[in-house]
């Protein structure tokens, strides 16, 4: 080394140097025998100075022949060197640099040793900042350390970069240069990141190609050791990092030779070590800081010479000689460009072309950017240069110019002879914008022009500021002669990219050809567009731009030919291969005319293959990659066919061997079939194609953004968009993915209406919101396409029609919905044939108004009727993340703000131009923003604080406006209501529009109103959500998240836990479970999963929940609770990911989620601080026990299986430890559940376990009510779902009460199925002899399988020897008080049998507060379910006036939608005179206006007059239940009355007497005058008026706009002789024409079949109504010319003369041939009573024909008493007419029930 490179060390320090040398192992006083190198400063007593270390000479003879060819990408080329010359690496994933760290981790896991014979220690950190800190620490300890990063990751390293450079520590950071997030995030290439660290003191060395990535990495590692200056080695992200090229690489032995002797030892000697201690990183004051800073100058002064010297030293080893500045071009060039990175090779090609054309041009290609050597730069410039264009791949908005431009300009100013050279700057290639030779030619044209554009841009059209230079796309060919080019268009996850990577390596590693491959992707995570650009040739290929003149193009997805101009890039006579199902005739219709013209005019050889069909036959499904690859090798001739076939088969073993022999065999079979057969088949191109005329064009949407920006983006034409169409700042409209219509699914779900139970599970789990429930009116159904089949809607949508509809062109075909459906109501069908039909259906469905407001949006089922405001995202098929966020938008979307961390959710949720977040019909929807990866919690926190502050301001203004009454009375009332609800859920949404409308009209009245109107967007209670993945929450963003959760701020955090960094390719995070194999943990993760939720719970004031798709109801509940909590909340959702490698595929995502819960792998729990304030345990464990096999669960995921293949013993050990950890964690949660608030054992010593099986929550609610009753009777109680117990524990439970519902056709609820399965297994006789039990079933007695599950459990427990305490009880949904009626009749027997003492009652705490507010304005109140209906006729009696029974018909005018068979619910009002009489007796003034503050869920008016409240709302004339009497006894002052009330409450004889006398609430208050609850309690104790339901006798098709009722005005005489009439009957009996009442539609079991099927109808009395409706409907259809099936009606009533209802109409149907009628009038002949069931027996042949042979349907409507006899009669008919046995006849009846052909409506 030249002496000038380092100053000579002063003699004063020589002794210290010698002394220091002995410390590192040299012999003191011995003369050096080898070359002397300078490295690093030596510690002295007060200051570090440089010194020399002498080491023995070693064999460093270059051997360039040791190099080997290998086809690698830039990342692998770099990692090869970095791994060899490092001993530690600290890594963190960030695209596009992650691959470098992944490879280092792979090699470490494989035990590969570096050049020094040691396995590199590769450690993943929590962030790039952590990686830099660890790097600094390792260097301080003397390690040879490195890291890999990009973009924001590099910026996070800046503080430590200053430290490392300041302390003169040798190191290399390898950077895949990438853009920084500014107006938008871009993962693509640019120099913004590296330019942001140019001031840190690190040397910066740039690679331009894949080969240089290897070489410059080597030069960096050598030069840093020689100079003690750390290096940033960078190359262009993606374009170089991910380009595959065949390059020469040095083996480790050769790399080791290049390590300067003694430099590593010198570095070690400077380490922090107690054997030679120093102090580093001190605090310096003003007296010495400046000087110490300047003391390092000597290390930088000649650093450029050190680098050049290193390049010279490396050259003999690699055969490639580099310069820090390389000049190419004419020696007398006048125009020169200066640039670095991958664009350099493109400019080089352009220079060669221009020089051949006689142009005097050249280029300076920069390698060493920092330190910038002015001398070296000036030296390479030709003396003839007149103009220079400095090209930067970054933009610095506020600077005079970009960095390279400034450096060039400053350099030339230092040389007088160069000061006349004109320098301009330009930008190119930002965000990996393809930089092609034509762009380079345009730059030279601009440079040579008279007035060149300064600070120009190239590759874009800047029509705003005019910076862009024009270029002509002349398709110049600058490639080496003999280069062949290919493009493969694929669909994400079809294997195309992987196959092409394999193909390049096959060709590169098995031939003399050089190879290059580059891969392009769109924004979709999976199922997106991929294009693979491959080149092959005899000479090295450095063209770093996309293929534009291809010899071979393959399109692996047929729809692409309609979207992409892919043949624009094919040369004349090239080969085109299409995977399609089309015949030549189909192609005429399907392939656009311009595409066909290209085929013909360019004389393209066109081949077609139906790859999917062929691969299906081999069992490969959509994985068509190997078939298409075989076609390529067969047609391209790149390799000899036999060799290509052999190599392909070998590559299959390598690629798929780990997936099993079967997969290998299938892929090899399909490859061999291609080589052996006539695949693909050449298409004989019709001559007419050359002149094909466009017959159709894409229909514009009329939305400018979609037509002008989004569609070009999707069609890969974004490069053509000008600057003027962009919005400065990077904002984009929402709801654009609905226009994408990618149509990527080969199969889509088809709805099977007959099987559907309308649970909406399919909609919940759909990752892309492509399958949804729709509710329609009859009128809407009539307008629907013929294929738009519906069925009768249930629940809140009574009277309407239900359909599950898929969006066929948005569906990804993931099959999650099909696999999740519990009723087999979905099946996958061929998309090719189904899409045309379903497209029409979808287009119709989405135009139907959303009716989500008609149901409870905060329930599982109800949430799915809400419009998803996240739809058609770019997430992978089967994604486990999107359903959570979709649910969030359905629950709170129209008032939600989302701060989204960078990661998967920001890519599928925030890709420019393709926004899946959308709006409702009002234009409201989630506002979404992304800051960075590391700061998302703080970003969201800032939004929350700002919105809270703004809302507080608007609240202050509204408070003043209300106090000052500046608005009219109506608006003031609304604003006052807003003040009450302003921070409570979505209550304000109900009247928000009214407020805004009122403000718009009145804002000119007062400045306060003007201010409020100006802040109207703050009126909603904004729901703030912070969303991100587990890597963000547990690692890089944990510090911020922890602070935000600790802040107490009201906001919500949702962590989408895939247990790895999914977005960057599946690297381990701290959320990754032990034993899992992930990138950066290929040897299996050896530490426990971080428990983020427990950390959050430790604060005590954070709502915390874990959720999973395996328990959808719990998930919905947790979301609702979290959002309602006034404070920070944290929800962590288990999100299955494609990176998990589910053996059954992502279609089974929900089942695997269920298994995760069952095995304890993912426990479900909620921590609600509000419960602690109530004295309850805030911790709620929702998965009560471990009940699955953990090992089986793990064995279904490749991430756990792969470790066992590589390290069986290690895998078993880690999995065993994980199982122990999971068990220990679960036991800890059990202890938390039993925590300090758990009651001690009951004093009585009695204990009961209450178990429930619940689907909708009824059984669970009843179980918890029962638990309270047992606790009051001094029992200790445990309440659990049946599936949460271990069945083996039953024998030790002592006493068990089971409450269980029946679902569907006799099915167990989901949370009891495992219990029943286990209980059915073989057990020892008398196994449960020590168990006492009782069972209560919930069901609907009109169903054949009424309480079937309860009966099964009861019988099974008895068979196992358990002792039945009391007989099974039944709760009938059809009873007036639903299941409570049966429960209240059953439970006393339990208390009696147990001999429990009657507990002391405690008065409940009311959920309402009541105030007298005389100045308030009363509100008009209607129940949510009600709609005004107008009586057209009043009540028209149809039985004689003197007859005792009064049947009436009523015609109603209404817009309510209903179906034949539905009932009309009528909301009665109490008689005003009776109410006023009661109020006067009670001492209440009916005119008083009261305000009710309602904290519960009950529907009550906010402000109302007392008289109206008791008339319209409270059921004061209803029948009290036994609990009412208990409560009333608290208020009884008179002792005798109190005792009597308590006696009645025990449900003894007096209670029965009261029931028989039909006493109502008003009666009871008269009977007990000393019991006077306050108005507050009175309202609590008296329930709301319920609608009474009456069968509808009309059909919408017959009398549209009308509903007809057939009603029996029911009156009766009580035992005491009192005359009673029902409340509603009283109102209807006196109904007048034109009178309006509140009504609603209620669905019944009467769901009628296809009109061509026969039906049998049995009616008693007014039960005739639905059958009249059915007859009217079929009669109308027949008149329309439609075919209808046979109809038989069996009608029963008392007397023919007076009660033959609708006689004339029924006779008319008989005469029309529509109806067979049989009537049974039971009291006409007292001696011989005839009933309906008797008449059925007489028609045995007709019954057998209609119901068994023709599979018709049976309907019964009327009294419950005739239901069973009719069934028996049917069985009789089947046996007699069909010759069936009794068992066979029974099975036929059962089949009718289970297939929905037997319907009952009984009372």
Swiss-Prot record:
Subunit structure: Homodimer.
Activity sensitivity to pH: Optimum pH is 7.5.
Compartments where found: Mitochondrion
Name used for this protein in its record: Pyruvate dehydrogenase [NADP(+)], mitochondrial
Biological process, per Gene Ontology: cellular respiration; electron transport chain; pyruvate metabolic process; response to oxidative stress
Domain FAD-binding FR-type: 1425-1650
Co-factor remark: Binds 1 FAD per subunit. Binds 1 FMN per subunit.
One MF term in the entry's GO annotations: oxidoreductase activity
Principal EC category: oxidoreductase
Main location as per UniProt: mitochondrion
Temperature note: Optimum temperature is 40 degrees Celsius.
Induction note: Expressed in both aerobic and anaerobic conditions.
One Pfam family hit: POR_N
Transit peptide: 1-37
4Fe-4S listed as a keyword: yes
Cofactor: FAD; FMN; thiamine diphosphate; iron-sulfur cluster
The protein's Enzyme Commission number: 1.2.1.51
UniProt domain 4Fe-4S ferredoxin-type: residue ranges: 747-776, 802-831
Positions that bind FAD: 1458-1469, 1585-1595
Protein's job: Pyruvate dehydrogenase [NADP(+)] is one of three enzymes participating in respiratory metabolism. The enzyme is also active with 2-oxobutyrate and oxaloacetate. The enzyme is oxygen sensitive.
Note, other: Arose from gene fusion of pyruvate:ferredoxin oxidoreductase and cytochrome-P450 reductase. Gene fusion has only been found in Euglena and Cryptosporidium. Euglena cells absolutely require thiamine for growth due to the lack of a pyrimidine formation biosynthetic pathway. Thiamine is actively taken up into the cells and is used as a cofactor after being converted to TPP (thiamine pyrophosphate).
Gene3D superfamilies attached to this UniProt entry: 3.30.70.20, 3.40.50.360, 3.40.50.920, 3.40.50.970, NADPH-cytochrome p450 Reductase, Chain A, domain 3, Nucleotide-binding domain of ferredoxin-NADP reductase (FNR) module, Pyruvate-ferredoxin oxidoreductase, PFOR, domain III, Pyruvate-flavodoxin oxidoreductase, EKR domain
Residues annotated to bind [4Fe-4S] cluster 2: 811, 814, 817, 821
Catalytic activity: pyruvate + NADP(+) + CoA = acetyl-CoA + CO2 + NADPH
PANTHER family in alphabetical order: PYRUVATE-FLAVODOXIN OXIDOREDUCTASE-RELATED
GO CC aspect terms: mitochondrion
């Amino acid at each position: 080394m030249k002496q000038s490179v380092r100053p000579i060390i002063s003699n004063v320090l020589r002794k210290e140097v010698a002394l220091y040398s002995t410390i590192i192992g040299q012999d003191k006083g011995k003369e050096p025998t080898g070359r002397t190198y300078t490295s690093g400063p030596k510690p002295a007593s007060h200051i570090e100075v440089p010194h020399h270390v002498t080491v023995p000479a070693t064999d460093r003879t270059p051997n360039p022949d040791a190099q080997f060819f290998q086809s690698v990408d830039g990342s692998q080329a770099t990692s090869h060197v970095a791994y060899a010359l490092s001993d530690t690496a600290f890594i963190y994933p960030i695209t596009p640099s992650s691959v470098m760290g992944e490879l280092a981790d792979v090699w470490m896991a494989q035990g590969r040793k570096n050049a020094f014979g040691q396995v590199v220690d590769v450690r993943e950190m929590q962030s790039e900042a952590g990686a830099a800190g660890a790097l600094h620490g390792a260097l301080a300890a003397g390690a040879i350390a490195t890291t890999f990063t990009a973009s924001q990751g590099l910026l996070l390293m800046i503080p430590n970069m200053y430290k490392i450079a300041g302390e003169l520590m040798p190191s290399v950071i390898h950077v895949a240069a990438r853009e920084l997030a500014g107006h938008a995030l871009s993962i693509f290439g640019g120099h913004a990141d590296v330019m942001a660290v140019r001031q840190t003191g690190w040397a910066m060395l740039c690679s331009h190609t894949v080969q240089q990535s290897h070489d410059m990495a080597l030069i960096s590692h050598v030069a840093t050791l020689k100079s003690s200056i750390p290096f940033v080695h960078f190359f262009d992200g993606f374009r170089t990092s991910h380009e595959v090229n065949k390059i020469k690489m040095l083996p480790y032995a050769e790399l080791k030779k290049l390590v300067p002797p003694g430099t590593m030892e010198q570095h070690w000697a400077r380490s922090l070590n107690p054997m030679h201690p120093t102090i580093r990183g001190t605090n310096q004051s003003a007296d010495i800081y400046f000087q110490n800073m300047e003391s390092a100058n000597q290390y930088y002064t000649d650093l450029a010479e050190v680098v050049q010297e290193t390049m010279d030293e490396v050259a003999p080893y690699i055969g490639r000689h580099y310069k820090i500045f390389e000049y190419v071009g004419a020696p007398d060039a006048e125009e020169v460009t200066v640039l670095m990175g991958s664009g350099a090779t493109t400019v080089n090609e352009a220079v060669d072309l221009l020089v051949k054309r006689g142009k005097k041009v050249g280029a300076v290609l920069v390698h060493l950017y920092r330190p910038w050597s002015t001398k070296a730069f000036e030296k390479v410039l030709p003396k003839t240069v007149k103009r220079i264009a400095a090209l930067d791949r970054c933009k610095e908005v506020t600077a005079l110019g970009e960095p390279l431009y400034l450096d060039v300009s400053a350099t030339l100013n230092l040389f007088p002879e160069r000061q006349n050279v004109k320098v301009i700057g330009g930008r190119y290639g930002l965000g990996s914008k393809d930089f092609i030779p034509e762009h380079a030619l345009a730059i030279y044209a601009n440079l040579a022009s008279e007035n060149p554009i300064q600070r120009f841009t190239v590759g874009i059209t800047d029509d705003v500021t005019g910076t862009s230079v024009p270029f002509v796309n002349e398709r110049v060919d600058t490639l080496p002669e003999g280069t062949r080019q290919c493009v493969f268009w694929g669909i994400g996850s079809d294997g195309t990219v992987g196959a092409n990577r394999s193909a390049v390596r096959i060709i590169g590693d098995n031939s003399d050809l050089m190879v290059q491959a580059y891969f392009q992707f769109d924004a979709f995570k999976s199922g997106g567009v991929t294009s693979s650009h491959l080149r092959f040739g005899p000479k090295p290929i450095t063209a770093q731009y996309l293929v534009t003149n291809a010899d071979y193009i393959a399109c692996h997805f047929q729809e692409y030919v309609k979207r992409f101009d892919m043949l624009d890039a094919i040369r004349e006579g090239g080969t085109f291969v299409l995977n399609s199902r089309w015949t030549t005739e189909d192609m005429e219709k399907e392939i656009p005319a311009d595409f066909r013209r290209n085929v013909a005019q360019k004389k393209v050889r066109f081949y077609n293959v139906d790859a999917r069909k062929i691969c299906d036959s081999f069992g490969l499904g959509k994985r068509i990659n190997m078939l298409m690859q075989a076609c390529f090798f067969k047609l391209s001739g790149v390799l000899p066919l036999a060799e290509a076939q052999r190599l392909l088969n070998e590559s299959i073993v390598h690629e798929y061997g780990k997936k099993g022999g079967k997969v290998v065999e299938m892929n090899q079979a399909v490859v061999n079939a291609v080589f052996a057969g006539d695949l693909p088949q050449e298409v004989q191109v019709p001559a007419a194609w050359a002149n094909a005329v466009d017959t159709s064009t894409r229909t514009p949407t009329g939305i400018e953004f979609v037509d002008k920006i989004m569609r070009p983006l999707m069609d890969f034409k974004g490069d053509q968009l000008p600057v003027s169409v962009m919005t400065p700042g990077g904002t984009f409209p929402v709801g654009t993915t609905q226009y994408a219509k990618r149509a990527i699914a080969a199969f889509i779900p088809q709805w099977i209406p007959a099987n559907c139970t309308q649970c909406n599970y399919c909609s919940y789990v759909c990752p892309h919101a492509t399958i949804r429930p729709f509710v329609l009116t009859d009128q809407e159904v009539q307008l629907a396409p013929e294929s738009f089949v519906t069925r009768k809607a249930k629940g809140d949508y009574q009277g309407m029609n239900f359909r599950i509809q898929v969006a066929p062109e948005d569906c990804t075909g993931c099959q999650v919905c099909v696999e999740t459906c519990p009723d087999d109501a979905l099946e996958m069908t061929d998309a090719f044939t189904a899409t045309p039909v379903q497209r029409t259906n979808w287009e119709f469905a989405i135009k139907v108004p959303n009716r989500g407001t008609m149901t409870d949006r905060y329930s599982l089922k109800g949430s799915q009727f809400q419009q998803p405001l996240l739809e058609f995202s770019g997430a992978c098929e089967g994604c486990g993340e999107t359903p959570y966020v979709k649910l969030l938008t359905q629950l709170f979307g129209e008032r939600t703000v989302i701060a989204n961390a960078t990661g998967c959710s920001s890519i599928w949720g925030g890709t420019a131009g393709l926004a899946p977040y959308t709006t409702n019909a009002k234009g409201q929807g989630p506002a979404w923003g992304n800051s960075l990866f590391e700061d998302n919690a703080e970003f969201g926190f800032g939004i929350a604080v700002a919105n809270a502050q703004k809302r507080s301001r608007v609240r202050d203004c509204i408070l003043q406006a209300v106090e000052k009454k500046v608005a009219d009375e109506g608006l003031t009332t609304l604003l006052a209501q807003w003040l009450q609800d302003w921070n409570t859920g979505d209550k304000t949404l109900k009247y928000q529009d009214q407020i805004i409308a009122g403000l718009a009209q009145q804002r000119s009245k007062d400045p306060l109103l003007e201010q409020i109107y100006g802040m109207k967007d703050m009126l909603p209670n904004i729901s703030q959500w912070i969303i991100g993945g587990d890597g963000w929450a547990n690692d890089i963003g944990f510090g911020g998240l922890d602070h935000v959760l600790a802040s107490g701020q009201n906001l919500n955090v949702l962590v989408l836990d895939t247990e790895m960094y999914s977005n960057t390719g599946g690297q381990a995070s701290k959320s990754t479970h032990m034993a899992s194999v992930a990138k950066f943990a290929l040897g299996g993760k050896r530490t426990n999963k971080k428990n983020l939720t427990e950390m959050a719970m430790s604060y005590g004031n954070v709502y915390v929940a874990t959720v999973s798709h395996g328990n959808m109801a719990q998930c919905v509940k947790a979301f609702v609770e979290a959002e309602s909590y006034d404070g920070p909340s944290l929800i962590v959702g288990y999100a299955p990911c494609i990176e998990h490698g589910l053996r059954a595929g992502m279609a089974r995502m929900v089942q695997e989620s269920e298994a995760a819960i069952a095995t304890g792998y993912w426990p479900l729990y909620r921590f609600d601080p509000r419960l602690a304030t109530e004295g309850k345990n805030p911790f709620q464990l929702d998965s009560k026990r471990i009940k699955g096999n953990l090992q089986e669960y793990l064995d279904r995921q490749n991430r756990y299986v792969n470790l066992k293949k590589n390290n069986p013993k290690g895998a078993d050990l880690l999995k065993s430890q994980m199982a122990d950890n999971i068990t220990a964690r679960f036991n800890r949660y059990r202890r938390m559940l039993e925590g300090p608030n758990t009651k001690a054992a009951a004093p009585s010593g009695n204990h009961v376990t209450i178990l429930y099986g619940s689907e909708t929550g009824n059984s669970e609610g009843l179980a918890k009510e029962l638990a309270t009753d047992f606790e009051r009777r001094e029992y200790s109680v445990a309440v659990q779902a049946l599936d949460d117990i271990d069945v083996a524990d039953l024998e030790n439970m002592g006493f068990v009460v089971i409450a269980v519902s029946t679902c569907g056709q006799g099915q167990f609820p989901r949370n009891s199925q495992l219990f029943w399965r286990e209980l059915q297994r073989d057990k020892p006789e008398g196994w449960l002899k020590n168990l006492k039990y009782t069972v209560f079933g919930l069901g609907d007695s009109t169903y054949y399988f009424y309480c079937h599950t309860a009966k099964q459990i009861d019988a099974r427990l008895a068979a196992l020897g358990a002792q039945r305490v009391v007989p099974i009880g039944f709760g009938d949904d059809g009873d007036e008080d639903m299941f409570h009626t049966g429960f209240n009749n059953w439970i006393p027997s339990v208390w009696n049998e147990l001999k429990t003492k009657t507990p002391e009652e405690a008065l409940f705490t009311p959920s309402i507060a009541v105030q007298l507010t005389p100045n308030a304005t009363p509100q008009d109140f209607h129940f949510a379910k009600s709609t005004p209906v107008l009586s057209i006729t009043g009540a028209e009696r149809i039985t004689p006036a003197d007859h005792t029974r009064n049947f009436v018909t009523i015609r109603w005018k209404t817009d309510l939608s209903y179906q034949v068979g539905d009932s009309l619910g009528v909301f009665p009002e109490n008689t005003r005179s009776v109410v006023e009489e009661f109020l006067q007796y009670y001492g209440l003034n009916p005119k008083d206006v009261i305000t009710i503050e309602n904290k519960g869920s009950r529907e009550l008016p906010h402000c109302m007059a007392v008289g109206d409240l008791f008339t319209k709302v409270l059921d004061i004339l209803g029948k009290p239940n036994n609990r009412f009497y208990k409560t009333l006894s608290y208020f009884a002052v008179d002792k005798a009355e109190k005792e009597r009330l308590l006696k009645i409450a025990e449900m003894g004889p007096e209670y029965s007497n009261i029931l028989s006398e039909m006493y109502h609430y008003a009666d009871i208050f008269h009977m007990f005058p000393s019991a006077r609850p306050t108005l507050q309690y009175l309202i609590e104790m008296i329930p709301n008026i319920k609608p009474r339901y009456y069968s509808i006798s009309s059909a919408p098709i017959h009398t549209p706009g009308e509903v007809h009722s057939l009603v029996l005005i029911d009156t009766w005489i009580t035992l005491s002789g009192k005359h009673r009439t029902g409340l509603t009957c009283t109102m209807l009996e006196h109904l007048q024409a034109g009178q309006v009442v509140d009504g609603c539609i209620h669905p019944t079991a009467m769901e009628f079949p296809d009109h061509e099927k026969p039906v049998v109808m049995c009616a008693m009395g007014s039960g005739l109504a639905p059958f009249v409706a059915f007859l009217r409907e079929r009669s109308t259809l027949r008149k329309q010319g439609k075919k209808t099936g046979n109809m038989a009606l069996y009608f029963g009533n008392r007397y023919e003369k007076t009660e033959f209802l609708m006689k004339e109409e029924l006779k008319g149907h008989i005469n029309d041939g529509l109806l067979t009628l049989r009537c049974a009038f039971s009291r006409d002949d007292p001696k011989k009573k005839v009933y309906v069931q008797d008449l059925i027996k007489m028609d045995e042949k007709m019954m057998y024909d209609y119901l068994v042979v023709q599979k018709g349907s049976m309907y019964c409507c009327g009294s419950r008493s005739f239901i069973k006899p009719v069934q028996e009669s049917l069985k009789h008919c089947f046996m007699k007419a069909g010759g069936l046995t009794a068992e066979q006849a029974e099975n036929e009846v059962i089949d009718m029930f289970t297939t929905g052909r037997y319907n009952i409506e009984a009372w």
